[in-house]
Amino acid sequence: MANDYLFTSESVSEGHPDKVADQISDAILDAILAQDKYSRVAAETLCNTGLVVLAGEITTTANIDYIQIARDTIKRIGYDNTDYGIDYRGCAVLVAYDKQSPDIAQGVDRAHDNNLDQGAGDQGLMFGYACDETPELMPLPIHLSHRLVERQANLRRDGRLPWLRPDAKSQVTVRYVDGKPHSIDTVVLSTQHAPEIDLPALREAVIEEVIKPTLPADLIKGDIKFLVNPTGRFVIGGPQGDCGLTGRKIIVDTYGGAAPHGGGAFSGKDPSKVDRSAAYAGRYVAKNIVAAGLASRALIQVSYAIGVAEPTSVMVNTFGTGRVSDETITKLVREHFDLRPKGIIQMLDLLRPIYEKTAAYGHFGREEPEFSWEAADKALALAEAAGVEPAVQVA
């Protein structure tokens, strides 16, 4: 890669239609796990103008009011007015859940005991990543993109910018020099708004109140290109503007394109699905490698076969930044992390109802108490085993 280059990532707000769907799916998952932690859940959601469709496969002993959960989630996000295209009080909610296929269940239904040979819920490959660009050990472009739409939501909720509406998108382009963030080049922010606000006033307020307070001062060098609502009017948004579906923001959910993605979405899936649990484990492993000072960048790939507990492969790539060889780090990963599906569930305590919070503003790089995969609690052991000094700054 060139020594001087631009890299871009994007995020979307909790009111984006795909994120509405993700949050409904994970709210349903949480409600089920709160009653029956051994449930099998694959909850998919579609939302459009005035309509929510809940479908998928659920096997559980829990007694859940799915319709009320969908309405409560839509209300929490802020769609509480028919002018917004969907209103939690009046939208139609259709429910079409089936049970998990017994052909799938036979390989994974060993969860009620301590048998660590519970098989993976599907085949697939998953990635984890960490780097030293931020205290959270995340790539800077996706980190800033998340913080922008998160701030947009906070300003909407507290009434400081009362004309903001729930749907928004952000995009941040960072200039890198010698592989390190050098400066912010471009910030794009498109936000849904009330019809009475004029565009010049909106753009000024968004730049001054949303964007500038979010950007690191040391990366503001020269003129930054601010593109706020570049198409102009953005009154129609949310599920009215676009049909929302669970699992369509997998790059937003992870590393903003800075690392590969195995293709499996997260939301609505219980942790027997390695699409979710192994991706969380990959982040946990990668973050501990970087926190331990073994490398400044770490990419983990892990893969599985359906019904088989042991991963079919584990790979570590530190992109030449490792203080010991990638082969040595891979060996340490196998020694210090149990990457069998049941081992991951136990290691990260994943049978808790913790998932709705993950469904907006990124699954990774957020220091929430529930996000066990963000802990750097194995960094010291890894550093000692490798014979290196652990990294000093870990969020």
UniProtKB/Swiss-Prot annotation:
A single cellular component GO annotation: cytoplasm
Source superkingdom: Bacteria
Binding site for K(+): 44
Binding site for ATP: 16, 167-169, 233-234, 242, 248-249, 265, 269
CDD domains linked to this entry: S-AdoMet_synt
Names of required cofactors: Mg(2+); K(+)
GO biological process: one-carbon metabolic process; S-adenosylmethionine biosynthetic process
Name of the protein in question: S-adenosylmethionine synthase
High-level lineage: Bacteria, Pseudomonadati, Pseudomonadota, Betaproteobacteria, Burkholderiales
